[in-house]
Regions:
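NTP-dependent small-molecule kinase module
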Residues: 2, 172, 178-229
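Conserved substrate/cofactor phosphate-moiety recognition/catalytic segment
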Residues: 24-83
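Hydrophobic positions on the alpha1 helix immediately C-terminal to the Walker A/P-loop
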Residues: 19
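Conserved lysine of the Walker
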Residues: 16
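P-loop (Walker A) phosphate-binding loop of NTP-binding proteins
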Residues: 11
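Phosphate-end processing signature that detects enzymes handling 5′-triphosphorylated RNA
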Residues: 208, 213-384
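Conserved nucleotide-sensing/catalytic segment adjacent to the nucleotide-binding pocket
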Residues: 62-124
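A glycine- and Lys/Arg-enriched "phosphate-lid" helix/loop adjacent to the NTP-binding pocket
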Residues: 120-182, 217
């Protein structure tokens, strides 16, 4: 059975509760079987399992951060409970549901605790003490939906709502919102949704995004630019407000048609690596990921040893939030690119500081870069 794991996150009053309720309303109790919470989508039967917010459960039942020895101790308990919940509920797949897919929706994920601790270093300590790695956590979710707080997008509308576990004031809520978003930067499929639109429109956007992901997989919805810059221009992005991940893409010969790229992906952060096998269709100047599977290191090595490497692309990805937008800057050997969500309408003033655009890139980014890399290597060889 296929499994999709989605973390639903965001700052206070971002619409998370309303979105989660709307997702639940998509499901029905299947009259043809004993199974409940079934979503019917494009001929597929999808078993929906939602995992409630751990912080609200703890606080509402008497375990509060203000009563703890310190915030770290509370977050450590929260992390442990959340980790156990995720591991246990995922065992439900073994129940043998009469469905094509199991969809897990987590009301907040394991990285959310970063927003409530004093520093990134403190969160790294918490992760280590719980026997995990940040990249391991980041890459265990297939999709991350970040609902920006109205404190960020529409401050005048922000107000405390009737959730007894919510106690953030507006300015603090804005700070928490930013730190929450920053905790998830570097995720392969992170999507930010603004709350300065009617709530129903925001809900519809999220629902459609989830449906598209289930139906079509990862869609290339990034605006891409070749930029002139220097790594030193990004000195303001540190471990506290960004994430830098080393990415190696090996293009393999698996005997598939020429319009399909089979890629072995290795992502490395703080000396820990995760691995993926991805199949990308390149037709009509469009790239669509039609297969994306997380694999272990042994499988990665086996596929690498048994198949021919056609090409290889290595880059350093710097991901960060600025002006409430998600940016990714990729540093290659001889050039640099900037990416952001095509749904974002950005002015020049909203682009990262010191970024100078050379040209817009269309179509497959990696294909463009591989070709450009070959040209640059040829030019270098002619100079020798």
């Amino acid at each position: 059975m296929d499994i999709i794991k989605i973390a639903l996150t965001g700052g206070p009053a971002g619409g998370k509760t309303s979105v989660l309720n709307a997702i639940k309303e998509l499901s029905v109790n299947d009259v043809d079987s004993k199974y409940k919470n079934i979503i019917h989508l494009n001929g597929k039967k999808i078993k929906l399992i939602t995992v409630p917010e751990t912080a609200t459960e703890l606080i509402s039942n008497g375990i509060t951060p203000v009563e703890a020895n310190n915030v770290y101790d509370f977050q450590n308990i929260l992390f442990g409970v959340q980790k156990s919940k995720e591991e246990l509920v995922e065992q439900a797949v073994s129940f043998g549901y009469d469905a094509d897919m199991c969809l897990f929706i987590y009301d907040r994920g394991l990285l959310d605790g970063r927003a409530y601790l004093n520093s990134k270093e403190e969160f790294e300590r918490l992760v280590t003490e719980n026997g995990m790695e940040e990249l391991e956590i980041l890459d265990q979710y297939d999709l991350v939906i970040d609902l920006l707080s109205t404190a960020t997008c529409l401050p005048q509308k922000y107000s405390l709502e009737n959730n007894k576990a919510r106690f953030e004031e507006a300015e603090w809520a804005k700070s928490i919102d930013y730190l929450t978003s920053t905790a998830w930067v570097g995720h392969r499929n992170l999507k930010l949704f603004r709350s300065d639109i009617p709530l129903q429109k925001e809900i519809d956007q999220v629902i459609n995004h989830i449906k598209d992901y289930i139906t079509y997989g990862i869609k290339d919805n990034q605006e891409k630019y070749l930029i002139e810059t220097d790594p030193d221009d990004f000195y303001q992005y540190t471990n506290e407000n960004s994430r830098t991940i080393q990415v190696n893409n090996k293009y393999m010969n698996f005997g598939l048609p020429s319009y399909l790229d089979t890629i072995l992906i290795k992502r490395t952060y703080r000396d820990y690596s995760t691995y993926f096998l991805q199949v990308v269709s390149n037709r009509s100047n469009k790239s669509v990921v039609i297969g994306d599977q997380k694999i272990d290191e042994a499988t990665y090595s086996e596929l690498l040893n048994k198949n021919e490497v056609i090409d290889e692309v290595t880059k350093t990805e710097l991901s960060f939030i600025e002006n409430n937008h998600l940016f990714k800057v990729s540093f290659y050997e001889d050039f640099t690119t900037l990416e952001f969500d095509r749904d974002d309408v950005l002015s020049l003033e909203e682009l990262p500081k010191d970024v100078r655009i050379i040209e817009k890139l269309d179509g497959s980014l990696d294909k463009f870069l591989k070709n450009k890399e070959k040209v640059l290597k040829k030019e270098k060889s002619m100079l020798i």
